């Protein structure tokens, strides 16, 4: 019992044997999580042709996050858990959905795109599908293609999901995180991955890989070219959505729609961006406004924008540059799946990102062509490729170690924690606590009830091993 507990490097690389504590933790992110429906693996496999091992339960989650001004707000999303299995240790996957104007056309309302998250979950993942702020039951207008809040909506949902698992289930978060998304969700995927790395959150979110699909990563290049180009654009509603979003986020894009759009389009678009739209969709908006940007956007606005293409000090340029996410140096692998026939989001977004990242010194970044389909037809091959790639990288569930790991009558609280953790045990135990990178930061033996000061510990996910005799208990603690 006095000998220091042993733990292998593989344990930390794979984070097996992690049992989320079943105690009454204080939820800092989770507001509610309510069951919606169940789906069988056979149904999901038949719809996709993928090999899927697990049935899936889907929940509607409401959680705390922040808006574009950093002010607390709520967001919603769909949360999927593998069901009817003795396996308990799964990685997290984040699926970011595509463009939607209707607040109710989102995963938490069980829309068609929610099927994608169910499929990933059936492959063995806890899946978070954020609706994004301003969508679902979140108040106000959605800040479309706003990188920071796309990221925080996803990150805070995973935090809320961890709280739910810890307090309501016996499932284990195995410490791995995978991120994907399609269309706008591709941008959100890239934004989330970049934010985790930029904000030094890798201890809390161990990103194994990300797979952005058909996304607009190069806003200041390719999207700007779309605005300026005389070539008609198939989805002019995207441009209007972008203007509305960045006006919400930055407040300096326009004063009123009539300042930036010609009549009658200035009055036509307004109801689509009221902040409570549940009936007007993108296809309707595209049908009501011209595909030629010179007929939609006033000459004065367009000329001011075009004439500043070198210095890029115009508010539109500043906003686009702020939300670019193609030119950075990822430390985890990325695959950007695309189709060459995409009429909505130019596949050169992926090529530009691949070139920029590799030029920056990235070790494992590729843009992958999955066919010549259009934007709609690219969904299945792109996301199937992402799924199959993730399956080669994730840690398989350890069915043996998922059983009989909670024989010790020991409680550790609170979880999540901040300044201290309390250990209460009915028997003498040894305890060792490890940082997310595998470093032992605390060890004590032959103890029972005691307190550990944790104020100096950084935020992240900590692994706790307790042992009494031959009984070993592995668990996870989260510091927020």
Annotate the PLM regions.
Residues 1, 26, 405-480:
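C-terminal outer-membrane/trafficking sorting elements
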Residues 27-86:
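Catalytic-loop region of hydrolases
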Residues 69-72, 83-119:
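Short, surface-exposed "cap/lid" segments of acyl-processing enzymes
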Residues 144-167:
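Alpha/beta-hydrolase active-site loop
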Residues 160-232:
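Primarily recognizes the serine-hydrolase "nucleophile elbow" in alpha/beta-hydrolase
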Residues 213-327:
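Accessory cap/linker subdomain of secreted extracellular hydrolases
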Residues 224, 317-319, 323, 344, ...:
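C-terminal catalytic histidine-bearing segment of alpha/beta-hydrolase fold enzymes
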Residues 336-342:
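Short beta-strand/loop motif that positions the catalytic acidic residue
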